[in-house]
A protein has these predicted regions:
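Short secondary-structure junctions
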Residues: 263-273, 424, 459-465
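Active-site palm subdomain of RNA-directed nucleic acid polymerases
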Residues: 404-453
């Protein structure tokens, strides 16, 4: 549910009343938006494709009001079977994937069509307005920082985040996740009860509060024994490691050291240092996450992804959530083209060519600060010392249930803000952004998405940017989005990925 208009709830989370300057900044943001409307929280889809009797993707409601299944059963007469199949209307793209473009995406598409060749110039003016609003809010940013001083680990990764502009975006959009800016000052709950952001699809917890509290207490009571078990496990794995496993351990240590050098986590500490720092009244008040390496790609282009085992550590078990994320379909560009074609038919105009830009949010989960640093400790085996070492992650470990929810709240807000401010049809798959644009936009939608991230100081990764173009190759797909006189987008695996699947 959206926050009540004009309540400035994100700002008030800091315990302050909005100033005249802040109210004016929100007013200017609202005036700059291309449309008005409350965000609709995703709901659980009803029916499944196999439900052919009364609901599901293969059931249609006829003009006579009778529901009929679209699935065609086998028939002894093959010609009759073929004739029946030819008359069946296949599910639409939205019905197949369960994904539909959000209202802000559709508004952006229609606005782009209205602007046409003037789109790049209009977006330049919008960027200028955002820049002016950001400058107007700088004193407010200092005021918010003073009202809620951040813990040291939060300051290290989120000390530069523009809290005032995040608040203004949330309040101007009437965005339901009113606590998001505050969490960048205080840290996000990562263990235990994870507050509902009101952005994603609701789910019912599987355990009541009393039983959950007992479970968490019982797990926390084993912290010391668990640390000993992790050390033994890592020593045993190192002793039994094959050459490929040894190489993975080496790369894993290098990646962890690189994150420490980039200020995303502490440098490695020893077992004794860990115990001294986190022992409270004779008990260990920390739960470590064993970090392991997952190889990705083929020989010659393989890389290691560091994964922290929240399942083995039981950290995920003591995490209680009330919502689950809803990711976009991999066919997002095709969904946008479908909406574009529909809008063009309604206007009676030709369908223009489109382009796709790809971006990546730098450091992803590591940029979202945790409120539970004692649970964000990754254990890594050091081949040189033949001992385990530990890294204190300031953000979120990769492998925790809470990491997924807390991180995705950030790009989700910024996608909607980009659509409303810049008419940029954009969605994200975790930390990967897919930005659609008219060819007439000359890549300005992607440039505006970048400008928005720079303004809130959660910057994108320039090295991973794929500039707006009609054809893109990425590790998981190749898409062609030009020639939209036919509303089609093609997706296929790159040759290297295809070879690995068939080998």
């Amino acid at each position: 549910m959206a926050q009540p208009k004009g309540k400035y709830m994100a700002y008030r989370e800091f315990g302050l009343e909005p100033s005249v300057t802040y109210v004016e900044a929100c007013r200017r943001l609202r005036a700059a938006f291309i449309a008005d409307g409350a965000y609709e929280r995703p709901a659980k889809p009803t029916g499944q494709m196999r439900d052919n009797a009364s609901r599901g993707n293969f059931v249609v409601l006829g003009e006579d009001g009778i529901k009929r299944g679209r699935a065609v059963r086998e028939h002894w007469d093959k010609m009759r079977h073929a004739e029946e199949a030819a008359r069946v209307k296949l599910p639409t793209r939205a019905e197949r994937s369960g994904y539909r473009c959000r209202a802000d995406t559709i508004a952006a598409i229609n606005f782009c069509l209205g602007k046409g060749e003037d789109l790049p110039g209009w977006r330049r003016k919008q960027r200028w307005e955002l820049s002016n609003i950001r400058k107007l809010l700088e004193p407010e940013n200092e005021r918010l920082r003073a009202a809620r001083p951040s813990p040291q680990h939060v300051r290290r990764i989120a000390g530069e985040v523009n809290l005032a502009l995040l608040c203004a975006l949330v309040d101007a959009l009437d965005w339901p996740d009113v606590q998001l800016p505050y969490k960048f000052a205080a840290g996000f709950e990562s263990v235990g009860e994870i507050p509902d952001s009101h952005v994603y699809r609701t789910i019912e917890p599987t355990m009541d509060e009393e039983a959950f509290a007992e479970l968490r207490a019982s797990v926390d009571a084993t912290n010391d024994a668990w640390l000993t078990e992790v050390c033994s496990l890592m020593k045993r794995r190192a002793k039994q490691a094959r050459p490929a496993d040894v190489e993975a351990m080496r790369v894993l240590k290098e990646k962890s050291d690189a994150e420490a050098a980039n200020g995303l986590c502490s440098g490695p500490i020893t077992l004794n240092q860990l115990r001294r720092k986190y022992t409270r009244q004779g008990k260990l008040a920390a739960r470590v996450q064993p970090r392991f390496a997952a190889w990705q790609g083929r020989a010659g282009a393989r890389k290691v992804r560091a994964i922290d085992d929240g399942l083995m550590s039981r950290t995920n078990e003591i995490t209680r959530t009330r919502e689950t994320i809803v990711t976009p379909s991999p066919e997002f560009p095709a969904h946008v083209v479908d909406e574009l074609a529909r809008a063009c038919v309604a206007r009676g105009i030709p369908i223009p060519d489109v382009e796709l830009g790809l971006d990546d949010l730098f450091a992803a989960y590591r940029r979202v600060p945790t409120a539970h640093p004692e649970y964000m400790i990754a254990a890594v085996w050091d081949l040189e010392t033949a001992q385990p070492v530990f890294y204190e992650v300031y953000g979120h470990c990769f492998g925790l249930v809470s990491s997924v929810l807390n991180f995705n709240r950030v790009p989700h807000l910024l996608c909607v803000a980009a659509a409303m401010l810049f008419a940029a049809p954009v969605d994200h798959f975790f930390d990967d952004y897919l930005t659609m644009d008219l060819a007439a936009g000359c890549g300005s939608a992607q440039a505006c998405l970048d400008a928005l991230h720079n303004a809130v100081r959660l910057r994108l990764e320039p090295r991973k940017r794929k500039h707006s173009a009609a054809v893109h190759r990425k590790s998981w797909a190749l898409s062609a989005t030009s020639r939209t006189w036919l509303p089609i987008a093609w997706y296929c695996s790159p040759p290297r990925r295809s070879e690995s699947r068939t080998s």
